[in-house]
Amino acid sequence: MTLSNLRFQTLPADAVERIFAVFDERGSRHYGENVSELEHALQTAEFARQFGESDAVIVACLLHDFGHMLHDLGEDAALQGVDAKHEELGAELLRGLFPEEILDPIRQHVAAKRYLCWKQPQYAAGLSESSRRSLALQGGPMTDAEADAFQLRPHFAACVSLRRYDDMGKVPQMQTADLRSYEPLIRRFLVH
């Protein structure tokens, strides 16, 4: 997996501008859904805002699929039978920029899908085709032991909430605020 096509060496020095540059360059890509990466990010954040989530959850929702834009595996790696581990890739690149209350839900939103499939077997039936396909690559529903451990995570509730908004944020042509409107909120959580 290579990040070279993003031309990181030419990205702005400012962390938020780097994030926006990645969205500008790769946000129009699709990942097996009927919305682009950018549309999905904005919708997921919008649903979190509508449901009264904390600002940290809103930022996590906005950035949760950042890792999808960082790999060069194509727009839907799951179709090729590949788990891109986008949740780990995104959280790793954002590490050092944001606190754990944002990074952990990003890192764990795939685990939250697996957890919800364990907790509510009917949940899997409501997943999009792309999410069901990737679920198989990501390990399927959690085991009892995995679920017990997952429920003890310090940001467990935020992880599950993000996952639910992630599932909702796939509405073609939904109107949302633009990416730049989140700049003050993102900057507020930067650790540098």
Segments from the language model and where they lie:
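Acidic/His-rich, divalent-metal-binding segments that scaffold phosphate/diphosphate chemistry
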Residues: 1-83
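Divalent metal-dependent catalytic cores for phosphoryl transfer on phosphate-bearing substrates
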Residues: 47-164
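Residues that form generic nucleotide/phosphate-binding pockets
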Residues: 19-22, 26, 93, 105, ...
